[in-house]
Amino acid sequence: MPSPKRTKFRKQHRGRLKGIATRSNSICFGKFALQALEPAWITARQIEAGRRAITRYARRGGKLWIRIFPDKPITARPAETRMGSGKGSPEYWVAIAKPGKILYEIGGVSENVAEAAMKIAAYKMPIRTAFIGININ
């Protein structure tokens, strides 16, 4: 699972998912991409599941770029623990995806292969997504 090697602080506030993605909202590396249409936290496990799905479908052809990284720690309390006594310990990591954010990019494969691979990865995501390409509108 992808996670930061080290962070300045162990725990973070939850924050709010307001607005649209102003950065990382256009294709930079490949020819085709999977773009988020809704705001959500995407866990490291979901990112990894999508990566595996795309690489398995595309086989050896093409190159994949993962444009999101889980850098936000999510804390959880142990089961049957009384309230109080501080915040829980970090359990897993999430990436913040706002509408318009590019999740994955792929290049070096045909449009049909790219679309099918991204569709499989889209099923692994907790949000609605769109398949976009440089030549497609």
UniProtKB/Swiss-Prot annotation:
It is found in: Plastid. CDD domains: Ribosomal_L16_L10e. One of its GO terms (biological process) is mitochondrial translation. Its main location: plastid. GO terms for molecular function: rRNA binding; structural constituent of ribosome. Keywords: Plastid, Ribonucleoprotein, Ribosomal protein. It comes from the Eukaryota. GO terms for cellular component: mitochondrial large ribosomal subunit; plastid. Part of the 50S ribosomal subunit. Belongs to the universal ribosomal protein uL16 family. HAMAP family: Ribosomal_uL16. This is Large ribosomal subunit protein uL16c.
